[in-house]
């Protein structure tokens, strides 16, 4: 007799946890990207204008709001704890962490050492602040 191997919709992991740490990606400043201040925009606000596919949920969580050059041990521990809580949730399929460029590789190495394998944990950053994006799109569309 064949068993039903389908899973119900309620058991499918469909949530993306977006953890904000600050950095240039969450920065504000002039449209040119020169003279910005890192870590000013909340993770929730970085989602503005992003189309989320039907059936998917993005759950933002602000862990820290700082320039990544200022990250220390306590910040890494707080991030690891937030990741652990999200990874333990069966609805969470993956984690995306917005971060600054200065300490991105140290954060990636630390998380690789302390988090369990299984679900993807992706770090992303930017070389220009979020406030420069509109000007970038305008220049790109005229190219």
What spans do the regions from the language model cover?
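Active-site histidine-anchored catalytic micro-motif
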Residues: 1-143
